[in-house]
Amino acid sequence: MSSTGFAQDREYSAGVQYTNGPLVIAGAYSNVNGLGTSTTGAVTADTAPVVADSERIAGAGIKYAFGPAAVAFVYTYTDIGQPVKNNLVHATLNGSSLRFSNYEINGSYQFTPQFSGMAMYDFTHGDYAASNGTVRPNWNEVGLMGDYLLSKRTDVYMQGVWQHVSGVADDMGGMSGALILGSAGQSSTSSQLLVHVGLRNKF
């Protein structure tokens, strides 16, 4: 298998879900070997957020709906082995491991048949073992969204996300500045705010 690179550039995943009335419980696991290390693998160099030997992600979540409201909690653990590059900010990584523990709680409420609101809080703890020391950054993220139906197919929405990163003494691996995915780029400070306003039409 080594001659074809199958063992190196592969990905496999599995997931389960249990539903009982208003209760939903789910779990998933993903494993990638050769993350972003080639142009033909499961996760190619131009699509991988991080270039590394391996990436393992395990997660579980629970959701409960009651009346017009719903609340959910999600936990994920990511273990990246031998990371060499942070593609999100084009920074070099020289560590032996990069790990993230992510905790999110979110909720939604249907105020009227036309208007719904959503909110979330996310906390991520990182652990990056580098050749010049260990850094343990933390990310705090808060998000709000409102959606209003203009018709069965058309709605207008507004959403905002604020992120703050702490625990990084210097620019280790490009992690000192806040970075919300979907923004124009990384902030030059430890905080970032992103606001979206959109009109959507479903065909």
Regions found by a protein language model. Give the residues of each.
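Low-complexity, intrinsically disordered Gly/Pro/Thr-rich segments
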Residues: 176-186
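Aromatic- and glycine-enriched pocket-lining scaffold segments that form the walls
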Residues: 1-19
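Short proline/glycine-enriched turn/loop segments at secondary-structure junctions
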Residues: 133-134, 185-188
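C-terminal beta-signal and adjacent terminal beta-strands/loops
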Residues: 152, 160-178
